Amino acid sequence: LLELENVHEYLDHSVGEKVISIEELFETSLKRTSNMSLLAPCDFQAVKACGVTFAKSMVERVIEERAAGDPKKAESLRNHIGGLIGDSLQDIVPGSEKASEVKKALISEGLWSQYLEVGIGKDAEVFTKAQTLSSVGFGSEVGLNPISNWNNPEPEIVLAVNSKGIIQGATLGNDVNLRDIEGRSALLLGKAKDNNASCSIGPFIRIFDDSYTLEDMKSANISLKVEGKEGYILNGSSSMSEISR
């Protein structure tokens, strides 16, 4: 479908047979009460992800690295490192002359990191998030490797890209991350990111057309709510307008 030149026109003129209502499908997907549930809206495509794309995440990656995966050390490092380099990373265009100047300054202060290199350097961090056909869909439980004690969901916008590199649409995803594993060594990124059911995508792809474009997506806000069985509630959000690369 994504290989078509005008996907939205094809879909506008497509006629299908109604199998189930959206409301019923959402309910069965969430409750797992039948065999009918939503799958991830991708099949044979490679599932890639980019890391260190926000200034805030750059600081967090440096904290993980300095803490060597120990969450107990993270808070004091967050106050120290965030105060030193947090503001200097705002509004920097990766690979620019200003980015090079900041890099030199941070190196002289002993604060340069491989994560800052992919955050404001000329080359982005691109990694394999999940194996083909391994992503789970809306309503499915995500997987957490039991070797991890410090981990988190990462709500993301997922781009639907065809084989020519053309972005045809977007959806939502959960880039589950094991912070204590990656924090020990960047070479453990694959172990921290690619686990059973660690990639959730869906529910649907919003195909770009005249009413919703890539430019519209760049100003989108993503919200996340985590509710624990013990009554713990966490609300968070991120804005695509703050993305740095």
Predicted regions: what they are:
Residues 1-3, 164-173, 232-236:
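Short, well-ordered strand-loop elements centered on a beta-strand within folded domains, enriched
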Residues 12-225:
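Active-site microenvironments in enzyme catalytic cores
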